[in-house]
């Protein structure tokens, strides 16, 4: 493993002002190759070019972007929006449903978002799984939740909802509250049908039941298996102990997080973000509030930025400690997990003193944080973290990471290359373990990360061992960042002085009756955000997490798209583990570091 300091910092990614990005290089390349008349470039607050194109050009455009001199090698996200009730669409192509494709070029450190408009009477698009293998699950999700068909898809079936589910939940005409449904009844016939739907049929997935000499065993790992790390089912095609193939089955933890965003105010949705990746705490608040602040045009004080960075890094450390303990436990050592949980308690002592809560503080606010840092917070950080954890990390490395059994179980196991990681949309430590130092905090700084001195650890083999060593070193780098926050915390307010800061600063509410009325409306009804689209990605605990928000000039989001890293990471499993032993699969699952709430949302 090595530490890297040189990064292709992209200043344009930090700009949130409305822009059509027509001057972006990729837009010029598309115009030159296909003709400008085929495209509509949209003005947004996303910070990336957003280009509408006709359905007939989708395959050609995606293939063209894949083959450019500095190609767009990662399909970062793919989803859709039901446009039928949207009011503010001036200058955009007529569309009932819009499918969007978010592509990333590592060489350019640049993105482009492609949009295709569809009429309700013809909801068909060609699959792009021939260009990006990870489009498979994203297209299944769009069909499941929006009802859009992708012609040529290898297996277009439900992925979040049960097979028997009726309707497509993210459509605007689909109920958003449980009280809008008929009462749920489960009679014997329906129970039998649901049990039958859970039966795995290999032929449906193109898997053989055996060869001319022997039959394969099909084994369910999960959805209630301790090594599955949550409600996750993995159907294994086994030849003895060898995994010939496998089919991940997700959706058991799906809660409709994106649908909830359409019926909560911009402010009241913050607690829901905590629970998208339930180990990340305020790390989950960060991309959401940053995206909302882009919509509102809020620039927060420097003190707010530094407080947010410090709290995010505290949650990164406690998440990585949990990973370390459970990962070593998966390999077979039982003791370290008790030590890592003890160390996490030290982190929670700091978090609880600052926020008043532990795992789910919901502490970040639109325009700031809930309240200022308490007196004596520096001593808490010093005693419970900076004076404690460095020695513990050395103990973990000596006792566990240098242990011959752990090394034998993990080195060379579940390895993949940088190219394979990018093709499957892998981010975070899973990508950096292959040798690529792509860290959003360095490449696309947000919340003032460009002011901090820290390094990005990378591996070289892309195996289960490197993924663990990268995270251990990331803990050290997070401590460096936190120490800089402690030593350089600026004075100033903990909220921005802006009309859309929610809740508004107290001094704005105690002047006369109008200020009290505005305060009442903003807190009870919710702030009204300008009609626009915004996007924000961050380097979260498991990889890159982002929110893509669409405002229609209301108190609630018109569309809340949550892109989580774990969804992409689980889709990669079959390509990595084929030909390995079942014991290697357990090691691989532990090295991914995922929670199912992050996958299923």
Curated annotation (Swiss-Prot):
Q: How does it assemble?
A: NDH-1 is composed of 13 different subunits. Subunits NuoB, CD, E, F, and G constitute the peripheral sector of the complex.
> What's its membrane topology?
Peripheral membrane protein
Write out the similarity annotation. In the N-terminal section; belongs to the complex I 30 kDa subunit family. In the C-terminal section; belongs to the complex I 49 kDa subunit family.
> Which organism's genome codes for this protein?
Shewanella oneidensis (strain ATCC 700550 / JCM 31522 / CIP 106686 / LMG 19005 / NCIMB 14063 / MR-1)
Keywords in alphabetical order, please: Cell inner membrane, Cell membrane, Membrane, Multifunctional enzyme, NAD, Quinone, Translocase, Transport, Ubiquinone
Q: Which GO terms describe its molecular function?
A: NAD binding; NADH dehydrogenase (ubiquinone) activity; NADH:ubiquinone reductase (non-electrogenic) activity; quinone binding
Region called NADH dehydrogenase I subunit D, residue ranges? 215-601
Q: What is its EC number?
A: 7.1.1.-
Q: Where is this region: NADH dehydrogenase I subunit C?
A: 1-191
Query: Chief localization class?
Result: membrane
The subcellular location is: Cell inner membrane
Which Gene3D superfamilies does this chain map to? Cytochrome-c3 Hydrogenase, chain B (1.10.645.10), NADH:ubiquinone oxidoreductase, 30kDa subunit (3.30.460.80)
Recorded superkingdom: Bacteria
What biological function has been recorded for the protein in this entry?
Answer: NDH-1 shuttles electrons from NADH, via FMN and iron-sulfur (Fe-S) centers, to quinones in the respiratory chain. The immediate electron acceptor for the enzyme in this species is believed to be ubiquinone. Couples the redox reaction to proton translocation (for every two electrons transferred, four hydrogen ions are translocated across the cytoplasmic membrane), and thus conserves the redox energy in a proton gradient.
Which PANTHER family does the record match to this protein? NADH-QUINONE OXIDOREDUCTASE SUBUNIT C_D (PTHR11993:SF45), NADH-UBIQUINONE OXIDOREDUCTASE 49 KDA SUBUNIT (PTHR11993)
Protein name as catalogued: NADH-quinone oxidoreductase subunit C/D
Q: Which Gene Ontology terms of cellular component type are present?
A: NADH dehydrogenase complex; plasma membrane
